[in-house]
Design a protein with these regions (language model features):
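Long, well-ordered, tryptophan-enriched scaffold segments
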Residues: 70, 151-164, 168, 176-209
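Structural recognition of the beta-strand scaffold that forms the well-ordered cores
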Residues: 1-2, 42, 88-91, 114-118, ...
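Extracytoplasmic/secreted proteins, especially bacterial periplasmic and envelope-associated proteins
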Residues: 14-26, 38, 141-148, 153, ...
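Noncatalytic luminal/extracellular "stalk/propeptide" segments of secretory-pathway proteins
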Residues: 7-128, 170
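Acidic/histidine-rich, surface-exposed loop or edge segments in extracytoplasmic proteins
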Residues: 1-9, 194-196
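Short secondary-structure boundary/capping segments
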Residues: 131-133, 172-177
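Proteins synthesized as precursors that undergo proteolytic processing into mature forms
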Residues: 125-136, 142
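Hydrophobic alpha-helical scaffolding
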Residues: 9, 13, 135, 199-203
Length: 209
């Protein structure tokens, strides 16, 4: 699987197909049973690229301030491709955990608004914390936070690094090739194909925002 002949097994690529065929043969030789008569399953995915018209503007006391992509904000790969506007509402870490009697959305109305949250979880550097991310990575991950925001009716999400736990407040979002000098231009992110109406704009913002 690490052979140079597979050329890194990029997704998709002939090298990845060769690796899949090899793994299927190993499964067969090991006596495993195929699922539904096949050693592989189809997963529909798509590559996405950052568009040319991304913009973020905040209006405070009637004054508009436009921010620069990369320096001030970077969209996540899970973002929706649409224009939204609305009031900003802060919702902590955007976590709802009934078993921990913790809910950042308790008493917070984000319906029709853009929710602002911190990345990660409370006390993220404390391994003894009940929010320990190693045990709850799926629950506190971005996908879970976006899903929770949508369930509460938010139309968009701005994400920040929590300043007490992060020395850098530089926006990261997703390492888009078009914003990087070191990432190959064809190294576009891949996501499962989904209806864009099920998404909301999700943007990582920096200190100036």
């Amino acid at each position: 699987l690490a052979s140079d002949a597979l050329l890194g097994r990029n997704t998709p690529s002939p090298g990845l197909d060769t690796a899949a065929a090899y793994i299927a043969r190993q499964f067969q030789q090991a006596g495993l049973q195929p699922v539904r008569g096949a050693w592989t399953q189809e997963v529909r995915m798509q590559t996405i690229a950052l568009g040319d018209s991304n913009a973020l503007t905040l209006t405070v006391n009637g004054k508009d301030t436009a921010f620069a992509i990369k320096d001030d904000f970077v969209p996540f790969d899970m973002t929706a491709d649409r224009l939204v506007q609305g009031d900003l509402v802060f919702a902590g870490y955007g976590i709802t955990a009934p078993d921990l009697t913790y809910d950042d959305y308790d008493g917070v109305d984000v319906r029709g608004k853009i929710v602002v949250i911190f990345r990660h979880e409370p006390r993220e550097n404390d391994t003894t914390s009940r929010f320990n991310s190693r045990k709850n990575a799926d629950r506190w991950g971005m996908a879970a936070k976006v899903k929770r925001a949508r369930e509460h009716g938010a139309v968009g999400m701005l994400v920040m690094n929590e300043p007490l736990s992060h020395m850098s407040l530089t926006p990261r979002g997703y390492p888009w090739p078009s914003l990087s000098r070191i990432i190959p231009k064809d190294a576009l992110p891949m996501t499962l194909m989904a209806d864009d109406t099920e998404k909301i704009p999700v943007v990582h913002v920096g200190e100036r925002v």
